[in-house]
Amino acid sequence: MDHGAPSTPAKHHVGVHSSDEGFLAVMVPFLREGIAAEDEPDPAAVTTSRKLDLLRDALGPDARHVDFLDSARWYRGTPANSMATALDYYVAHASPEGRLHLAGEPVWPGRSPRQISEWKRYEALATELFTGAPPDLMCLYDTRTAPPDVIDAARHTHPTELHRHGIRPSPLYTEPAVYATQDLGPLPAPPRDAIGIGLDGDLTAGHRFAADQAQARGMAPDAAARFGRAVSGATGYAASQGCDRAYLKLWSTRERVICELRTPRGRITDPFLGFRPPGPGTRPEDGLWDTRQVCEFVDMRSGDEAKEGWTIRMETALVPAG
């Protein structure tokens, strides 16, 4: 995936439909195009079990050339978890040249407004990560199950829309970095009873602080250790940016543990930090990949020209011991 070609958007289509017939009208031609593509592996369809059955019936004998996958398993966890699933699948199944037809329908029912907001940004991220790469990706949106604001967001995060008459550019498409950072207000202040420490010199000391505090609040030891490693991904990134001082604050509710890292200087300019998987080399932000895999929410904020410094706030479920 070429991050140096932002002017060439990925083939990342949105397929909006409002009926089973509309679903098949966009999916069947897309999958048959993948089946017919020379030197390309079988296409994949990720959706509900009911819609997978519809596809099998509509494709007939061609169904044997499609990899059918249940969306409940593909899209479980956080957006970062699903991105890891998609990237792992792509690496394992794409042709040597990177070609693959892959269509998926995200799961919207049961998600909170905050989770939905994160999933909207996930779609912008997919366009960013696959920019310059050769796969054909399509995301399905059913107006019967996806809220109207989600449908609207989809048209902002996908460069093209695939419908029964072909592919057309999306007039609402917004550059991924712009979409991912719009409407980000300031984070709420930590509660007054938050526990804080200053980190000077060895910023990685935050790992033990976070793990101990999480366990003291009732989190199971193995979960607390994972959370400590997630926090070390953020402190390690701070150290790589030349920060010799930082501050950690940690607090909890009955169901959540939250840890915040603040630095007195520097800025975060990349809205996709931690979403790109580690590659063959080592990058300063690689530890943030693990941070996002462990934490349900990872919020990043940066100061402006008048106020330097940045914040990474990490939040996860309080998994109780026993």
Language model segments and positions:
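Positively charged, polar, low-complexity stretches
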Residues: 1-188
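Short amphipathic
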Residues: 16, 190-199
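Amphipathic coiled-coil/heptad-repeat helices and related helical stalk/stem segments
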Residues: 27, 122, 231, 284-287
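Conserved beta-strand-loop-beta-strand hairpin that lines the nucleotide-binding pocket
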Residues: 185, 236-322
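The cytosolic transmitter module of two-component sensor histidine kinases
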Residues: 199, 203, 227, 284-287
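Conserved short strand/loop->alpha-helix "switch" segment adjacent to the catalytic nucleotide/phosphoryl-transfer site
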Residues: 204-235, 239
